[in-house]
């Protein structure tokens, strides 16, 4: 195809994982890629020195949601000025295709795509509840892809092949993994410490990702309890850690949820209660309604329910998780985008 493709969006890991999947697929097909993200968030840490990119641009953009009065006006004005910058960039690099993965980072480049005649905008919505930016711009998109939308041309979620490669069917719970994410989740950490003594008595091993801020407290507490645990704050070996586990306790961000599915790992989800539009709860509810996971809100956490879950038929759930997601999602999405560009 002529020209380069713009990938835009980020701010948080969930958006950035999907951006990375698109970059990898397009790069492997020999297509030039420009990434447009924000200085505020994790975008720069992910892509500043990425050799797969023709260019990486980080704009001083901030979210508009939850702002009021003058703050909201200034944020909107900032987005408009950055959108005009993106328009000039599109002309310079002959940009006709923009892929947005959402998040406040995506706003300027997405609006610029809408304003540019002949530009095709594609949106990937990660969550069961559409983000504010995507709600506003979806009507202008050539196509919107979502794992939670029955009308989406591709319903599978872009997940790294590692999670599929390490997948296995579980029969019995010998190891439980607690995943609070790289930022950690005190709620999950405290719950793990509460159930750890009984897990030890049952002969069940524990893997625990605490997040950086809570690592020393949790590690010290396990030592005081005399329980040997594979406890860590952050790891690049999460697919391998998942593979070692037979059951998981986790937040329900979209990327994490589908990674666990790809690994065929039965999971007890505890959604982050302050997630926008309560999307983590509704992400997990899609699986819960199919009998493919266990789900409790933070305020309803119940040790008895947890132990009932690990003693349930995890073999059946693990087998059914295999067919809940296919490994070629990003390839199928890019095929559709490239095919549309030929029209």
Listing of model-derived features with the role each one plays in the protein:
Residues 243-257, 265:
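Acidic donor-binding loop of glycosyltransferase active sites
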Residues 7-20, 186:
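A short, glycine/small-residue-rich beta-strand->loop->alpha-helix junction that serves as a flexible
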